[in-house]
Amino acid sequence: VCIVPMYNVRGALQRNGALRVNQNGPEAYGFRGNARNLDLNRDFMKMDSRNTRSLVAALTRWDPDIYMETHVSDGADHRYLMELLLTHRDKLDPTLRSFANDHLLPGLYTWMERKDIGMCPYFETVDGPPEHGLEGFVDGPRYSTGFSALQGRIGLLSESHMLKPYADRVNATFQLMLATLAVMDQHGEELRTSRMQAGSNTAAAEAFGLNWQIDTTRTELLPWKGYTASERPSAVSGLPQLHYDRSQRMDTLVPWRDHAIPTITLTKPVAYLVPQAWPEVIQRLRLAGVPLDTVNEERTERVEAQRITDFGTVREPYEGHYLHQGVSTTTDTIEVVLHPGDVLVPMGHRTDRLAMEMLEPRASDGFFAWGFFDSVLQQKEWFSDYVFESIAAELLAKDPELRKELNDRRSTDPAFAADAWQQLYWVYQRSPHYEPGHRLYPVMRVLR
């Protein structure tokens, strides 16, 4: 057993008793953000903090069979002392999913029930209080449990209920730790076998699903122990405010959606090519245990090159980044020159899924989404309209098909037809003068 008693060191030292307004004690506690105001349980893919880089390196080196992290919840009121978040089972390899369903979860819930500690799955409310419906949490790889799945292990996260007495929360967390150890002691061999098989399955897989979300078409019923909820006039605003009446217990069944599906599925390449110009990307791959081959001599490779055609960016910074989302790409097969010092990420390993989640530009928690490649999004060279006008006219005169495309665009887009500069830029983008590296994603997919 390896224990990290203080992960967020600077945050733990920022003692206070006021900043967790939803929380019932203790008298003093730490702060969520580290010295750079980063939430470390959003940092596992981007690894901005030294804290996370140290922990990921330790996980890679030690390779535990189960990872467990302890938290305090921040959400709805109910009668359960503990909420349990497990790496979403639909995202796990089938062998690990079976172990979780057959051994881990039954063992944990049975232990906690024997200790008279109420425990429920970690959830998100759908529309108001819990009785209106609950959804499971799809833990992307920015979170410790989602990242653990990509390293081929089950991740657990305890969320003791913030309004329960502090001593009870501590005991519940301790008992869940003991329960986990008991399951591992009893079923350790099955767990190790499951992990080995999961690694082999990942290495042999031809494709992986990415960007998972809750399947809203599948609903079950979950036994629920809560409190009657109602709306009362707010003493502050006078408007309706949610209120839980702890004098009125409620035992019922609530709608429960906890099946996840990927929104895209991508086939594996033979390898990824990461140019040496991106050392911060290579460093993170290495820390996560992804096998790398350094190119020793110049050679040519046939690759799939992706160009970013569209993306959205959040308006407010999140964990030190302006996240990209809704990424669209086009793909071309080209030949590129590999230089000594460039890095190949070969597939055929248990880390294949982790590498794909890091390196694919459409992956919602990948390096492109976190802004690691933002410099390729900026166009460096432009044109003066009075200079390019004659060049554009000559290009159109020599290429009837290009002129037809321009005329078609003008006939279907009135705003475009009324904008002389946009029409020149349209021609410029299709000319030899347009820089080939603009929006060209630097990481290539090797085909051989």
Located regions from the model:
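Structured catalytic-domain cores with a bias toward divalent-metal coordination
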Residues: 1-448
